[in-house]
Amino acid sequence: MSARGTSLTGMPLVSAGILLYRVTDDGLEVLLGHPGGPFYSRKDDDTWTVFKGELDGNEDRYAVALREFEEETGHLPPPDADPIDLGEIVQRGGKHVVAWALEGDLDPDEAASNTFEMEWPPRSGRTAEFPEIDRVGWFDLATASTKIRAAQRPFLERLEAALA
């Protein structure tokens, strides 16, 4: 990576993701993931995210979104759900994120994320393994808007507008 949010070729990094939603008696709820690892362990508000991952080259964006949902929840996305295109946002570091909403249900207690390794503690020479997503939860839109990363809030607004 040559600069934050760009690839070695200078092109912006792009991630693709899925925002799972359900409609309950209490209204619209969305499923968000809390990033794993030591940097996020004490953070909550403005930290949760849609389930997403970076594209590798010219991969199909929607296919990447579906794959990343499975990797980060341990579950296949709902196969018969009609995707709602939530468009694209740019996060603070310059990374572009595209997302689709799918209607479905998932028990957060049954979610299991893939893992990553990093040196921890810093400069210790030791490697530790962490889940990419350490918590998963359903939130009503008001709560979700405080939990989700600020740059991703438009996804919530676009979903609400699409379902109105």
Q: Residue spans of the language-model regions?
A:
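N-terminal strand-loop-strand
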Residues: 8-50, 100
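The catalytic Nudix box helix
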Residues: 50-85, 140
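Actinobacteria-biased recognition of intrinsically disordered, low-complexity terminal regions
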Residues: 1-9
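Short, charged/polar surface micro-motifs in flexible loops or helix N-caps
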Residues: 24-27, 37-40, 56-57, 93-94, ...
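Non-DNA-binding regulatory cores of transcription-related proteins
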Residues: 128-134
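Active-site-adjacent beta-strand/loop module that shapes the phosphate/pyrophosphate-binding cleft
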Residues: 88-125, 137, 159
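Short, solvent-exposed loop/turn elements at beta->coil junctions and helix N-caps
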Residues: 6, 84-90
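Charged phosphate-binding loop/patch that engages nucleotide di/tri-phosphates or the phosphate backbone
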Residues: 137, 141-164
